[in-house]
Amino acid sequence: MASRDFLRVFGAGEGAGPPGDAGAGQPDDDELSLGLSLGGRFGTDAKRPRLARSSSIASVCSVSSLHADPSPAAPLPLLRTTSLPTETEEERWRRREMQSRRRLEARRKRVERRNSMGSVSVAPADAVSGRRSNASQGSNSASTTEQGIGGSMFNQSADAKSPSTSDNRNQNDMLPPTKAAEKPLNGTATEQQPRLRTLGSLTTRTGSTSDIRKLMMEDMPMVSSKVEGPNARRIDGFLYRYKKGEDVRIVCVCHGSFLTPAEFVKHAGGGDVPNPLRHIVVNPAPFS
């Protein structure tokens, strides 16, 4: 292309035109800035239209708007961004009124429930008093029949029934009124079961108590005084448990005081003796 223009300018021929026609399609001035000006390639040519500036900020105006209308535009009102709708005063008052109504309704229900529970507790009290009167009548009738059978058997059964009667009453108090009213005639059958349980518990309790007594007698044996004289008397006590290096102490049964062997003999009326341990007798354990 350059060789063709060169031949057209410097070559001879009919098609060759004036030198001014060759640069008609080229720009008037050569581009020497290489696009490094503020406006880029288009900043050097004032005749060419400028590019409109695009901005994401609404308050910044573009170049075209500045040329069109120099007066500043009115600022737009900022919209409230929220995930919940704005609550008016009427809605707030309505919501508070509904909450107060719910509280009053819950309080009324609690009062009604409390009153109903009080009335129910009064009714079982009357039923319990009726059951106790029936139980007393049944025990009186049973005692009359046992008196006709024999006096000795009555005494033994009365001693055995005394703990079972209280257990039976406690069990009847814990039963609901419907079950107690349905079975008023089975008093004898209900009395036998607590009696068996009571005897078993008494047996285990007696066994454990006897074991405790044996251990206590082994650790602290019973002693008594053996004194001669006009003011002599027998004083019982038990040897208090002591460790090695401690003084021997005897607990007097009549007063519960801790005494030394000499004081124990003097308390029995023996006076001052040279060897008080000879006047103290250790009693054998009754459970051995």
UniProtKB/Swiss-Prot annotation:
Basic and acidic residues bias locations: 91-103
Subcellular localization(s) per the UniProt record: Nucleus
Record region (Disordered): 1-50, 66-207
Keyword annotations: Nucleus
One Pfam family it belongs to: NLS_NINJA_AFP
Highest rank taxon of the organism: Eukaryota
Protein name: Ninja-family protein 6
Organism: Zea mays
Taxon lineage: Eukaryota, Viridiplantae, Streptophyta, Embryophyta, Tracheophyta
